[in-house]
Amino acid sequence: MATAVSYCLLSCIFALLVVSFASAGKDDQDKQVYIVYMGALPSRVDYMPMSHHTSILQDVTGESSIQDRLVRNYKRSFNGFAARLTESEREILASMDEVVSVFPSKNLNLQTTTSWNFMGLKEGKRTKRNPLIESDTIIGVIDSGIYPESDSFSGKGFGPPPKKWKGVCKGGTNFTCNNKLIGARYYTPKLEGFPESARDNTGHGSHTASIAAGNAVKHVSFYGLGNGTVRGGVPAARIAVYKVCDPGVIRCTSDGILAAFDDAIADKVDIITVSLGADAVGTFEEDTLAIGAFHAMAKGILTVNGAGNNGPERRTIVSMAPWLFTVAASNMNRAFITKVVLGNGKTIVGRSVNSFDLNGKKYPLVYGKSASSRCDASSAGFCSPGCLDSKRVKGKIVLCDTQRNPGEAQAMGAVASIVRNPYEDAASVFSFPVSVLSEDDYNIVLSYVNSTKNPKAAVLKSETIFNQKAPVVASYSSRGPNPLIHDILKPDITAPGSEILAAYSPYVPPSESDTRHVKYTVISGTSMSCPHVAGVAAYIKTFHPLWSPSMIQSAIMTTAWPMNASTSPSNELAEFAYGAGHVDPIAAIHPGLVYEANKSDHITFLCGFNYTGKKLRLISGDSSSCTKEQTKSLTRNLNYPSMSAQVSGTKPFKVTFRRTVTNVGRPNATYKAKVVGSKLKVKVVPAVLSLKSLYEKKSFTVTVSGAGPKAENLVSAQLIWSDGVHFVRSPIVVYA
């Protein structure tokens, strides 16, 4: 009897345990990482953010131990934490007066031997520099880490870090900083096979860091292609890296990115470059980059961000806040071309970075559709995985309707591949000989194959040319208009982003299915244009160390090379593709006038964007409030270097922009307004500005009127203020 009772009791306990474990398992599955953003740090001396965060989390979860809940604290530059929460816990936290927002931690995506010469920033003594101030400049790189042994980041010849530096070298396992690479932190989770370290396991972070501030390294090439000196915009500057991207997956969590901003600001970096972007965007208080960059701006730090790689369609821009300096990508005059010689003697010019030399030998040509017996025609034409028959492609050159799958041809024994890309405006590295052709050129090859009994071709090693039309906005570069703030023009500026040769990590091959390992390679993207502008911003700061982030941004935008619709593959998008134009580093040193917007101006902007009361005070960290006038203020009146307005396309419109300029040129200057390139009626009042002293400010209005533009189109003009020496240019954009 006792045995039966004991058995029954054990059975009941076991059943309860099963239910308990099942419930716990379900509860864990229901939890996800949320960011609890609480605004600026309170100014009270006795405020202890970590204790406060712990107390809040204990109260909401009902758990005394929150070790498994708390992911990280934000405690150095702004206030908040990341934690594993259920939906009901998220709702409770979101309702608290001391909380600005609670939003899921998402994954963000990762977005040179001649590019700096192309922009006018020449090597050596040909470019004016302030080496001592440049050496005191620190660029914070929020990315995938860095390869510290690269010559681009050597500390040889550098003195100790600047006295203002408050950071550390916490690079982790087998990682050493130096007097060039002065700081390193990492925020990535521990993954099997990857040591906990700030080392770069994707190559992306090393590439972007060297573009911005890498040392000058001579005789660099990619297997002989692009040979020259690789260097950053400010080679004497220091670098601090903040690794936020998971090794092996090339994804970057927003809770880690926010922690990187928290540290970078407190570490006293001068410029932040962040070549990351979200797939989808929300409001400002749920936008990780916007939050981090706002607090950086409040501390005098400019954040530069890539526009995104989702072009050429409109409204694909993902960097939208006005305190983020948003950079589109263009080409430069250098290009890598890969010729295809057909059996009939015709030569077709394609694009790729092909370092493989087949010695001009011609091989049989086969189309993917003809090399498959188990896929439909479309999939076979694309050389989709599992479609190609090795017996039909081995030892041949395979034509594929897309450049996404040449590796399939290689895996099946092909010696080379010819692929199609309607936007073949940026050469890529492949793991075997590939030439990427335009639609028309690809059809020429296809026609030759279909009309010839034994078609043959040769794919030659790439050549470097220097006569390419430039700058032209890259097809992949994301376009406006701004989907969140319709009256703020984005992108802001354009810089080289295509076919950039820069430092890399030898831990990862330069392309998919590649067996090679290199320390320098060629990559394209707004990830590459972003650090170019960060380097320019740092360069300007060496001449004007007291300038605010908005002054530096204005100087770059108003002195940019003018661009026009012919420099964008989607011509009708114009300024939505290139913003104010192409960056000109030398002109940006002396802009004449600047449009300055400080923290209080951005607070007024937030008032007009319906941020009021307690939430506004939490974000600002002070007693800021919105007056009735500020609440009614239009976002287009933020003192921004460009002017943009969305209007009705069905009726005449009239919009007014209010702006203020600050004289940074010369005293006793008179600037006259001129409007060029417009079908619009534009009135500037006053049309003449007399400035007696440096840093004197003058305000004016710009009123634009006309018939409503056609749907999905824009109409633009250029306002130029000139004193005969300086030409301060701002785009004016109106769209429906």
Curated annotation (Swiss-Prot):
EC number assigned by the record: 3.4.21.-
Annotated organism of origin: Arabidopsis thaliana
Enzyme class: hydrolase
Gene transcribed to yield this protein: SBT4.6
Glycosylation sites: 174, 227, 450, 564, 598, 610, 668
PROSITE patterns, alphabetized: SUBTILASE, SUBTILASE_SER
Primary localisation category: secreted
GO cellular component: extracellular region
Protein name: Subtilisin-like protease SBT4.6
PTM note: The C-terminal propeptide is autocleaved.
Protein family: Belongs to the peptidase S8 family.
